[in-house]
Amino acid sequence: MRHGLLALICWLYCVVAHSEMLNVEQSGLFRVWFVRIAQEQLRQGPSPRWYQQDCAGLVRFAANEALKVHDSKWLKSNGLSNQYLPPEMTLTPEQRQLAQNWNQGNGKTGPYVTAINLIQYNSQFIGQDINQALPGDMIFFDQGDAQHLMVWMGRYIIYHTGSATKTDNGMRAVSLQQLMTWKDTRWIPNDSNPNFIGIYRLNFLAR
């Protein structure tokens, strides 16, 4: 009886979790919105509504904003016009909250998650071949004392350095060619670099 109850609970959990995932069409639109929002942080500078500005913070912010309703109020608050925008996504209320309920480990969820926990508990490993990356996927490096995320934008890579000054907002954009020839080899995304762990994709996206 007990085993049957546990199996039922696990089945219900899987059904609920699966129902909150984005389907293929939703995932494609999410990626376009995610990339656009990340691009705006580079073009305009970080939004004042983006708290905890670091590499993982960029992913959290872009994901959360991508899942919102992009009405006129949202456009104004993000400094965007209604021209050249991606199609709007049709999402359930639960799906719109996906980036507010990150798995933080130890059975906890919330709007904040570190880079390592974003990878460990909220993403799936894709591989170490950059050609496998889709726009919005994360490029993950582990330097021992610190972990770092970069975002594949489709044609280039962006990231936040984790620090900012009055003259430097911390946002960076580099081409894949630049990264592959980086003088500091710890940041080269190929399998010969032990610090490069791989390409990761958010769990709620369809593969």
Please place each PLM-identified region on the residue numbering.
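...with weaker cross-activation on analogous glycine-rich loops/strands in unrelated enzymes
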Residues: 81-167
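N-terminal capping segments
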Residues: 17-113
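Active-site scaffold segments
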Residues: 57-61, 149-152, 157-160, 173-177
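N-terminal signal peptide c-region/cleavage motif recognized by signal peptidases
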Residues: 12-15
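Low-complexity, Gly/Ser/Thr/Pro-rich intrinsically disordered linker/tail segments
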Residues: 161-163, 170-207
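Positively charged n-region of N-terminal signal peptides that target proteins for export
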Residues: 1-4
